[in-house]
Amino acid sequence: MPIYHKLGTIPHKRHIQFTKPNGDLYYEQLFGTVGFDGMSTNSYHEQRPTQVKEIRAQYSVAPIIAKPNNIQSYRLRGFEVPAEDDFLESRKIVLTNSDCHIVLAAPRKSTTSYFYKNTDSDEMIFIHKGSGKLRTIYGNLDFKYGDYLIVPRGIIYKIDFDTEDNRLFIVESHAPIYTPKQYRNWFGQLLEHSPFCERDIRRPEELETYNEKGDFLIKVKKNDEIFDLIYASHPFDVVGYDGFNYPYAFSIHNFEPITGRVHMPPPVHQTFETTAFVVCSFVPRLYDYHPLAIPAPYNHSNIDADEVLYYVDGDFMSRNDIEAGHISLHPAGIPHGPHPGAAERSIGKKETLELAVMVDTFKPLMVTEEALKISDDTYFQSWLE
């Protein structure tokens, strides 16, 4: 996140002696991204962060592909994904390509017996149902319905839920997740026309420091496999850090919509971006106010991108028979648009209360076996009259 952040105690300069009260050194770690060119954080540890005692299990979590080359539109009933106790086991990859995984999860329990580190991907975790606390090596973030949690790759975390009925929409991105460049100046500051600003970004608080030795299980994801690593010290042993690479939260309810006299294109709803996809937030807003406006979107040939919409709440103006938790996939190569009657119904309406998250990928998405378990195979015919 291009906002400088500091928690805990740090020395006045980088890479100099920083000693404990007994005279021993704290252990400095540079956590960089994109080699030495991306955002980074310097942290200071009670113990060496390199002490691996054992490498135990190694197992694949790669998705099983059902349709590697797809041109069919799909509707997935996301709430039909069964709830499971374990956070990682509950994650079901429904759509994927070489740049990202799109995941549904319904974990019932907090992560108590292990820590997790995804070295493959930045994670965008959207909280559809549930609340709790994301506990990380860089401090804690409270979360609730409507929050996006952005966890850069390699950050060790646990997730604690206050509830058992939890529904998450997750995107794992092999490229870093940033705020949209059209909303930033050359310093990285969000501009006046941005639909959100730095005040809306929640940064970690409550830096918990544990100077403990023992056996600590960290599940590390690398190349779509999980490695069970036993570390000799508690990973949350940071006494202080500063930098730009840390997890943060942003509520979809703080996204300020951009409207116009006629229908505005999806880029005005953009919230995050990578080199491989964009994320948009559709939120309650006033409709278009031209006297002859048609608030429903026009038909669109997304010839260069697959469109994924995750429906959160409200009535989505352009679709029929869509419920909370549904996902629609409109693949590149064929046009999509409002369902029959949707455009006519929208005329004269003053506002919409819809809430949805859109992911547009620049490479085609493959459909997994997990997706077919919850799919409506006739959805592509729902535009027939």
What are the roles of these predicted feature ranges?
Residues 1-385:
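Jelly-roll (double-stranded beta-helix
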